[in-house]
Amino acid sequence: MEEKRVLIKISDSEWEVMRVIWTLGQANAQQITQILADSMDWKVATVKTLLGRLVKKEALWTEQEGKKFIYHPAVSEMENVRSATENLFSHICAKRVGATIADLVEEATLTQEDIQQIMKQLNKKEPVETIECNCIPGQCECKKQ
């Protein structure tokens, strides 16, 4: 089955499960529980509940192998990360996006390759003269009432 290219809103706990499945390519509930048991202190029942939600949201698809269900990603990790980032930026003033990106770069631990990729994108970027505030009046400093 081909991965979807749409944003599926998932909770922080569901992200943890998806990260395991994206890494492994496919997994059953026991495998996921083993990987997340120490850090999350989850039991199999918790993982199965999260898997059920992810299947319902169409983030995963399943196949049955004997008595076990094997879970496969139905959404791309990179597309979901990109969509989550766009969603984050939609919640802040457009005039703050650049400063927010700069803050993220400042806080992140980066390799030389990471820095080169960021610099490459910045060098290709054409600046605009001004950025218009996209907030409702009263939501930011730009449009104080």
Curated annotation (Swiss-Prot):
Top-rank taxon: Bacteria
Subcellular location: Cytoplasm
Alphabetically ordered keywords of this record: Copper, Cytoplasm, DNA-binding, Metal-binding, Repressor, Transcription, Transcription regulation, Zinc
Single GO biological process annotation from the record: negative regulation of DNA-templated transcription
Residues binding Zn(2+), per UniProt: 133, 135, 140, 142
One Pfam entry name: Penicillinase_R
Induction entry: By copper.
Protein name: Transcriptional repressor CopY
Species the sequence originates in: Enterococcus hirae (strain ATCC 9790 / DSM 20160 / JCM 8729 / LMG 6399 / NBRC 3181 / NCIMB 6459 / NCDO 1258 / NCTC 12367 / WDCM 00089 / R)
Gene name tied to this protein: copY
